[in-house]
Amino acid sequence: MIQYIKGDLFTHAIPAGKKVILAHACNTHGSWGGGIAAVFRKKFPKSNNEYSQYCHKNSNLLGTSFIIESDQPNILIACLFTSDFNQTPEQIVHFTKQSIADLARKVSDYKEVEKCDGKVAINMPKINAGIFGVPWEDTESALQEFDNLHFNVYVI
């Protein structure tokens, strides 16, 4: 399920005793250089370093995810590896599906994460729609395939 929330992703309320997942589409080069990723870099510098090191130590990241314990308590950052800047929008959507499926597997056993209607809540902006240039409707359609997750999509 996708729920649209007007507001700032970074002001998402953290339920008592829970952790929230803030997800965004990432490149595989280890650079949160522009768009929403640059905001993540400024707000979570230690997480940015961990993401960068992870990218430099690993290969074949497209279609996978990486969860980082953020600089702030109770916030997990989910990096969705959807592009290395060489993909068409269709390929990015394909890798988005794979990375969301990977994330779903990784968070399925997390007891302490925020849930909506019994489903793990993934909080995100309109991923892929900025620098990666994918029409939001294409990514939205991909997210709708995951009925085991609840997506809070923040729009300004």
From Swiss-Prot:
The keyword Hydrolase applies. It catalyses: ADP-alpha-D-ribose 1''-phosphate + H2O = ADP-D-ribose + phosphate. It comes from the Eukaryota. InterPro entries: ADP-ribose_metab_enzymes (IPR050892), Macro_dom (IPR002589), Macro_dom-like (IPR043472). It holds the Pfam family Macro. Residues 1-156 form the Macro domain. One of its GO terms (molecular function) is phosphoprotein phosphatase activity. Its EC number is 3.1.3.84. GO terms for cellular component: nucleoplasm. GO terms for biological process: DNA damage response; purine nucleoside metabolic process. Keywords: Hydrolase, Protein phosphatase. It is an enzyme of class 3 (hydrolase). Substrate binds at residues 7-9, 25-27, 32-37, 127-133. Highly specific phosphatase involved in the metabolism of ADP-ribose 1''-phosphate (Appr1p) which is produced as a consequence of tRNA splicing. Belongs to the POA1 family. This is ADP-ribose 1''-phosphate phosphatase. It comes from Candida albicans (strain SC5314 / ATCC MYA-2876).
